[in-house]
């Protein structure tokens, strides 16, 4: 994982086993092997893509975002937040995008600090206050309302995990990959959450 290759699959019929012709495009795995934290991010992203994306279905937006994430893995202060955005994009590409633009209750576009765990829509502080124990936290960086703050990546990972489990994995009788949990443990140990 981590190397970009050009792969061409050929078979006489689509149902046949076929074979791949693979040529290296960009080899970056060597750099990632030297950084256990970055490697855990790469493993988590690969495992999530494998668990969530249907076979034989093209998802070019996820692939492009994945390339951006791989490039960012060499910048430890940047990639954890980018990983959260990648998971949110994965949800969106699968048809389960979060609506973080305006409050589901009032329609306002400011003071968005919660997400409804049922609808996946943002909720403002005022409208969500009576239900705050049941709401998921919405980090500002996920909807462009501020810089990355301490705890935002952890909140973002919890948010995306909730919806990936509920809408993608559980219906397919799957669980979040262990590689994602290991990445979170490493991020905690490094003080990056």
Could you describe each region identified by the protein language model?
Residues 1-193:
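Non-catalytic alpha-helical scaffolds and adjoining flexible linkers that form interface surfaces
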């Amino acid at each position: 994982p981590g190397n970009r290759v050009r792969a061409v699959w050929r078979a006489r019929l689509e149902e046949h086993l076929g074979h791949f012709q693979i040529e290296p495009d960009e080899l970056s795995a060597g750099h990632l092997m030297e950084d256990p934290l970055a490697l855990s991010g790469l493993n988590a992203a690969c495992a999530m893509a494998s668990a969530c994306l249907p076979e034989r279905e093209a998802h070019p937006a996820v692939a492009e975002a994945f390339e951006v994430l791989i490039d960012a893995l060499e910048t430890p202060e940047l990639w954890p937040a980018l990983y959260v955005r990648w998971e949110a994009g994965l949800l969106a590409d699968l048809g389960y995008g979060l609506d973080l633009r305006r409050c589901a209750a009032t329609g306002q576009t400011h003071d968005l600090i919660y997400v409804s765990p049922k609808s996946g829509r943002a909720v403002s502080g005022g409208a969500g206050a009576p239900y705050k124990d049941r709401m998921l936290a919405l980090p500002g960086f996920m909807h462009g309302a501020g810089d990355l703050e301490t705890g935002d990546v952890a909140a973002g990972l919890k948010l995306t995990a909730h919806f990936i489990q509920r809408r993608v994995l559980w219906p397919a009788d799957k669980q979040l990959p262990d590689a994602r949990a290991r990445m979170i443990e490493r991020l905690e140990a490094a003080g990056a959450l």
